[in-house]
């Protein structure tokens, strides 16, 4: 049985033109891509390896900078090896602390310098303790010298904490006594400084003063410390000491004092003498220190050989020293 023939469409639909170019594009898209050559693949792999190496180098360089800049990471750098995650965590904690404090100290060079100085001192203290433990052994833990040394270093480390505001013109507290501690030929100067309470007791065993009786001395400016030690520097130069002794020697005068117009130097000595008397650590007399008293004086109530009280000789030596130091 034959199937009935369907009616054909219009002539325009059957006789329409066929687009050959569109079929060519479809055939090209369906065609698989060509595989690259082996030389191109090797060049691409090499370029990718170079880029990856540069990226790792930048990461490692940034992490090393963070180890150096973050104080907590810098403190743990010598003891153990830090991982990258630990360095990043310490950096995050440090930035959080800076944000919590309002950013104070981030651009303060002095605060950062003092912080790194205290960190370095604590590292050295740890090494000293470890060295003493290895050298002396566990049996030397009851040694009094070792105990005194460690307690002194611990107290010094506690005092080295950075202060919020600078106390002087210098970035670090001045400690000018190291020159005098290294000079064994100056026992009189060390005794005078110990009497005045300006030398720590671990340096001078014979002094029973506390370790640091004057806390403000550690942060004293260099100008004040230099002014303190200038008068005692006369002991180092024997020629100047002899000249001061000759100046302090009483002059021969007649028994009846002749009225003389007061000179400018006498006026200065009259103004300076009460100040020196009030600021002197010890009363004038035979118990004074040898650096300032050139001639032993008798009782202050008895007149001197030239008809003057004995205290005038001491004031004269003080004034001569001060005027000579001012000229020096």
UniProtKB/Swiss-Prot annotation:
Gene3D superfamilies: 6.10.250.980, Helix-loop-helix DNA-binding domain (4.10.280.10). The keyword Protease does not apply. Pfam families: Hairy_orange, HLH. It is found in: Nucleus. Disulfide bonds: none annotated. Residues 116-153 form the Orange domain. This is Hairy/enhancer-of-split related with YRPW motif-like protein. It comes from Homo sapiens.
